[in-house]
Amino acid sequence: MINSKQKIAVLGAGSWGTALAALVARHDYPTILWGRDVRVIQSIDIQHQNFRYLPSIMLPQTLRATTDLAAAVSGADWVLVAVPSYAFTETLCRLAPLLSIGVGVAWATKGFEPGSGRFLHEVAREILGGDAPLAVVTGPSFAKEVTLGLPTAVTVHGEDACFTQMVANAMHGPMFRAYTGNDVIGAELGGAMKNVLAVAIGVADGMQLGMNARAGLITRGLNEMLRLSAVIGARPETLMGLAGLGDLVLTCTGDLSRNRRLGFALGRGQSLSDAIREIGQVVESVQTSDEVMRHAEQNGVELPISEAVRAVLREEITPYAGMKVLLAREQKPEYLDILFKANCSL
């Protein structure tokens, strides 16, 4: 029987790329996963396991894997990019000449372009041109839980409604809900900022500051998301949904969160280099904290938690000093109307 479903190429054989490739393959979409590490790709293609990033979890036998990018995207109806933010631009530059006209590109990468601070949709539009359908996949989702088939909900945002729905349809299933929207800026902002804020919560947990401190930091962190969203063209309801609040809660409370684990290690007194080495995977917040503050400073928005995280990750202050700075801030109204008064101070 001929499979009439779209062929999907997933780029990035880390934990998240593998999880998403396995997800759509289980939904009977012909799927091929591309990655650079020959050993990882061979383990996926032959043994149906990603021994490095998702050990001991069996992947669908229908999922194919390759290190040949041209072979991966050949005949693909659309492409899903799931590489770290530092590799996003380079991956799209390699992808662009291989794409057929009309082939859409979605990405599950969270963060900004390192160095420039550009949103990833801006990078994608510049490289892929004005006609390529684009979408971003984001929301509270640990790769391991998705691969194990545990219930998950994400959101897909894009300006092209048909392509956005196509991506969501491929992912949506009995244990995986995919919602849709068209606020690309808000979706990307939430996915980037939550990583920075998770470091602060991790630090507080590592310092054993208690559950009250955790709740306060999460709530005021959401306030920072909303504040920045109001001046860069994002919609506040996006940040109150899966792309913002949902992802923030998961990343700040889940032990699988690399960014929270980094903060926890720093709060326990570990050095930044040792903590990153122990985690063994990319920790997006190290780069993203600079880019978040770049946007805040360009727009005159005060983000004290994000600013403290940046200073800690730059090793300009200790985690203890960072918490003291936050606790010493002047008392003021909570400003529940921050959705409309973006420039009032926290």
Swiss-Prot record:
Annotated residues for binding of NADPH: 15-16, 36, 110, 143, 258, 282, 284
Role: Catalyzes the reduction of the glycolytic intermediate dihydroxyacetone phosphate (DHAP) to sn-glycerol 3-phosphate (G3P), the key precursor for phospholipid synthesis.
Pfam families the UniProt entry points to: NAD_Gly3P_dh_C, NAD_Gly3P_dh_N
Pathway(s) served: Membrane lipid metabolism; glycerophospholipid metabolism
Active site (record annotation): 194
Entry keyword Nucleotide-binding: yes
Lineage: Bacteria, Pseudomonadati, Pseudomonadota, Gammaproteobacteria, Lysobacterales
Residues where sn-glycerol 3-phosphate binds: 110, 139, 141, 194, 247, 257-259
Catalytically driven reaction(s): sn-glycerol 3-phosphate + NAD(+) = dihydroxyacetone phosphate + NADH + H(+); sn-glycerol 3-phosphate + NADP(+) = dihydroxyacetone phosphate + NADPH + H(+)
Main location: cytoplasm
Keyword entries, A-Z: Cytoplasm, Lipid biosynthesis, Lipid metabolism, NAD, NADP, Nucleotide-binding, Oxidoreductase, Phospholipid biosynthesis, Phospholipid metabolism
GO terms for cellular component: cytosol
Localization in the cell: Cytoplasm
Family membership noted in the UniProt record: Belongs to the NAD-dependent glycerol-3-phosphate dehydrogenase family.
One GO term (biological process): glycerophospholipid biosynthetic process
Protein name per the record: Glycerol-3-phosphate dehydrogenase [NAD(P)+]
Superkingdom field: Bacteria
Alphabetical list of Gene3D superfamilies matching this protein: N-(1-d-carboxylethyl)-l-norvaline Dehydrogenase, domain 2, NAD(P)-binding Rossmann-like Domain
A single MF term (Gene Ontology): glycerol-3-phosphate dehydrogenase [NAD(P)+] activity
NCBIfam families: PRK00094.1-2 (NF000940), PRK00094.1-4 (NF000942)
Xref: InterPro entries: 6-PGluconate_DH-like_C_sf, 6PGD_dom2, G3P_DH_NAD-dep, G3P_DH_NAD-dep_C, G3P_DH_NAD-dep_N, NAD(P)-bd_dom_sf
Organism: Xylella fastidiosa (strain M23)
